[in-house]
Amino acid sequence: MKFTLVATVLLTFSLSAFAVEYPVLTTASPDQVGFDSQKLHRLDGWIQNQIDAGYPSINLLVIKDNHIVLQKAWGYAKKYDGSTLLAHPIRATTNTMYDLASNTKMYATNFALQKLVYEGKIDVNDLVSKYIPGVKDMPGDKIKGKDKLRIIDILHHVAGFPADPQYPNKNVAGKLFSQSKSTTLEMIKKTPLEYQPGSKHIYSDVDYMILGFIIESITAMPLDRYVETTIYKPLGLKHTVFNPLMKGFTPPQIAATELHGNTRDGVIHFPNIRTNTLWGQVHDEKAWYSMGGVSGHAGLFSDTHDMAVLMQVMLNGGGYGNVKLFDDKTVAQFTRRSPEDATFGLGWRVNGNASMTPTFGVLASPQTYGHTGWTGTLTSIDPVNHMAIVILGNRPHSPVANPKVNPNVFVSGLLPAATYGWIVDQIYGSLK
């Protein structure tokens, strides 16, 4: 008995001695980690000029060498109620939560997949039909290939699916119309391929809707519950959730988006469309109407500090503090350039050529990766410079520039702030 007890103690001590302790974020002055503070401070005036010109708000956080060196908010979380400018707009703070839009794909869906791959619960070369049996070729399909679709094809956006079938808009979706999650899965199975899988690259929301369903199939949990309980909670994240208004948050904590629901200032109509200013609900139509606010492609809300922790997990090679989600091999696997398109890894956008300059600027290393979100969000992770940048914004919280010409271009989208690369370059240009 004594021998067993001693052996157990020694084994416990041995395991604890080899336990991985990952770096955690601390605060440092820019000068301490190689920035010229005076140059970096110039960014303050440039961003404020964009706010004065009409950009709703920008929240910015910069990480360098495991330190937060800049965290600041500019502008307004809510300045409009419909078309009316508020007499007392709500200022954005560094705690303001934002609709991440397509950054959901990385910090919910990809994080979940990276964890499941590391745990051996899924292989990216598995067939999609292993987890969603109904994804298969049908006799009347003009383009076939669903039978052989692999998860890696979905992640590389070469699976053949259209970019945006607009399931909740019956006028566009036709027979694929859906405004319920269970029906949406069936409509995805029926969605025709637009091209032969592997023959070209089309960035598709459908791909990540499918990945969300696959995660739910493997974990037997809703996507939001899985990521919130197994990823965000262990990391100590307090403001990273789907459907925040259902989880204890209030509108004043969140940045508002489109002024007139999803109508693009009154030119788009479909059953159940929202018409009031969106405030605390996901903007994305498929995520809200077709998926109940929780989807693999959109729906996540967060603030800059929580996003900084998630980016630091990637810089650390898969963990934070005493929490390990995956390993450095998994990070390398998911951020490796796709053979079909050098600007994509497994889901991650990669700084693979000059086409990514509007996103990552001209000064970030070629190994930089991250993602953007339609609402005005950017994450940029540079493992060479051990640096990361998160920009959160609410770009659609402004009038549509010309609804009849292009309902998807907002006044704020015409400003330089809508192109993240110039902000990224100002930050890199401040390095000594």
UniProtKB/Swiss-Prot annotation:
One of its GO terms (cellular component) is plasma membrane. The gene is yfeW. Its EC number is 3.4.16.4. It is a single-pass membrane protein. It comes from the Bacteria. Keywords: Carboxypeptidase, Cell inner membrane, Cell membrane, Hydrolase, Membrane, Protease, Transmembrane, Transmembrane helix. It is found in: Cell inner membrane. GO terms for biological process: proteolysis. PANTHER family: BETA-LACTAMASE-RELATED (PTHR43283), BETA-LACTAMASE-RELATED DOMAIN-CONTAINING PROTEIN (PTHR43283:SF11). It comes from Salmonella paratyphi A (strain AKU_12601). Belongs to the peptidase S12 family. YfeW subfamily. Pfam families: Beta-lactamase (PF00144). This is Putative D-alanyl-D-alanine carboxypeptidase. The keyword Kinase does not apply. InterPro entries: Beta-lactam-related, Beta-lactam/transpept-like, Diverse_Enzym_Activities, Pept_S12_YfeW/YbbE-like. GO terms for molecular function: serine-type D-Ala-D-Ala carboxypeptidase activity. It catalyses: Preferential cleavage: (Ac)2-L-Lys-D-Ala-|-D-Ala. Also transpeptidation of peptidyl-alanyl moieties that are N-acyl substituents of D-alanine. The chain crosses the membrane at residues 7-25.
